[in-house]
């Protein structure tokens, strides 16, 4: 399954603190990171695109980073997958 994680900075934390911690941290087992973006905003500050079989790796991410970030995780599909699903829905609806 494909997920997007949005990490928004909690008040009182600095970018420098986050970078120092990130340099020492790796994603948990079961999380295949496809992309990680650092934004020039506080909310969200980080966007990660992750493949995982379940939500389990995100529990560990929340434990590791929950003090510094508000973390939201959403299941997603690619634009190509979404368009294919729309085509199939439109075709089946034409009966």
List where the protein language model places each region:
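Conserved, structured core segments of small domains
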Residues: 1-95
